[in-house]
Swiss-Prot record:
The keyword Cell membrane does not apply. Expressed by the venom gland. Residues 1-17 form the signal peptide. Contains 2 disulfide bonds. This is U-scutigerotoxin(02)-Tl3a. Keywords: Disulfide bond, Secreted, Signal, Toxin. It is found in: Secreted.
Amino acid sequence: MKYILLGLLLMVVLANANRLADPNCGVCTLRSICFMEKESCPKGFKMLCF
């Protein structure tokens, strides 16, 4: 259980670091309405659109 939580925390940190590098890149969240792929985003990251 501890390792699962650490993994989730690491994913959040990496996602936020990526978002700082390119504000248009983000990861899927339950709050988001839709997602669009963006070529400049690293693989697995998507552009947030609200």
